[in-house]
């Protein structure tokens, strides 16, 4: 299948595409742990890049948590935490179940840090943030 591969990627090619054609929009995810930070930096530098989901082969809960946490810490809500690249329905069901738990856990931790610092958070702000992560980021990215 297109895009299935192993090992660390050279993201220079992606960086060149982003730089040379800022009017084109790119959705990207990478396989190697070693590429995750570099991909986040590219997403901060180039508004025409949206990071989305975790590649099928890194779909272990501990790795999904690590990647999602890193992306939220570097990009805030400016990414799509999970997508379906499931090839059969039963993969989709279990993938979403553990991804949802991970996203929830990370958001609860981040909101707790804000509350501990004296920041006031209301239910509508949490709903807004979740809608961004699970729906609106994608729609906004394509329409901007």
Q: Which residues does each PLM region occupy?
A:
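Histidine/acidic-residue-rich catalytic or RNA/ligand-binding cores of hydrolases
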Residues: 1-8, 36-45, 61-68, 89-106
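Mid-to-C-terminal alpha-helical segments outside catalytic/metal-binding sites
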Residues: 77-78, 94-144
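Divalent metal-binding pocket/active-site signature
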Residues: 1-35
């Amino acid at each position: 299948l297109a895009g299935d591969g192993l090992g660390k990627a050279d993201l220079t090619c992606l960086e060149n595409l982003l730089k040379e054609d800022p009017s084109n929009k790119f959705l990207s995810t990478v396989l190697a742990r070693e590429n995750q930070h570099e991909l986040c930096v590219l997403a901060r530098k180039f508004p025409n890049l949206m990071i989305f989901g975790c590649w099928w082969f890194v779909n272990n809960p501990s790795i999904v948590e690590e990647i999602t946490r890193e992306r939220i810490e570097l990009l805030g809500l400016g990414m799509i935490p999970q997508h379906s690249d499931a090839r059969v329905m039963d993969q989709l069901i279990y993938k979403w179940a553990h991804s949802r738990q991970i996203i929830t856990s990370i958001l609860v931790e981040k909101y707790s840090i804000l509350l501990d610092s004296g920041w006031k958070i209301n239910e509508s702000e949490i709903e807004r943030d979740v809608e961004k992560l699970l729906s609106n980021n994608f729609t906004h990215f394509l329409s901007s």
